Each structure stands twice: as structure tokens, then as C-alpha cells.
């Protein structure tokens, strides 16, 4: 497994999964995007190079969007009684 597999397959899927699960558990839409940004920044400067910095921001924005969508879905399900 090389760095590109990690950067463009495993990391995005992991961030998406953790964003959904973390938002369901913590009910805080900002926690998981911040955590994904920190993880991506650490990986940028340890495993990847500075060109991955843009992807770190993109993955954090995707995490923020998924966190808000998850929070809305959880609240709607709670309101409907399911």
C-alpha cells in the first residue's frame, strides 16, 4: 500500500465514517471536522508533503458538511419519534 492509497482512498473514507459516527455520539458538528483537520495536518507533515495541505482543507470541509447533515438527520428522526 503506497501513500496515494492512503491519501485518496483510506483517509477520506475514514474521515467520512468518523464524521458520521462522531456526530451521532457527541452531537457536536464542529468536533469531528476539527479532529479531521488535526489528523490531516499531522499526516501532511509526517507522511505526505506540503502539496497535501489543500486536500487536508477539503477533507475537513467534507467532514463539516457531513457532520451538519448527520445532525439534521438525527434531529429529524428524533422529532418524528423513530
Curated annotation (Swiss-Prot):
Membrane topology: Multi-pass membrane protein
Ribonucleoprotein listed as a keyword: no
A Pfam family hit: DUF2651
A Gene Ontology cellular-component term: plasma membrane
InterPro entries assigned to the protein according to its UniProt record, in alphabetical order: Uncharacterised_YbeF (IPR020258)
Keyword Transcription regulation: no
Location within or outside the cell: Cell membrane
Protein name per UniProt: Uncharacterized protein YbeF
Amino acid at each position: 500500500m503506497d501513500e496515494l492509497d492512503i491519501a485518496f482512498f483510506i483517509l477520506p473514507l475514514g474521515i467520512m465514517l468518523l464524521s458520521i459516527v462522531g456526530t451521532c455520539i457527541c452531537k457536536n458538528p464542529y468536533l469531528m471536522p476539527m479532529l479531521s483537520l488535526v489528523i490531516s495536518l499531522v499526516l501532511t507533515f509526517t507522511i505526505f508533503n506540503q502539496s497535501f495541505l489543500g486536500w487536508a482543507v477539503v477533507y475537513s470541509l467534507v467532514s463539516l458538511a457531513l457532520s451538519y447533515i448527520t445532525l439534521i438527520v438525527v434531529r429529524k428522526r428524533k422529532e418524528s419519534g423513530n
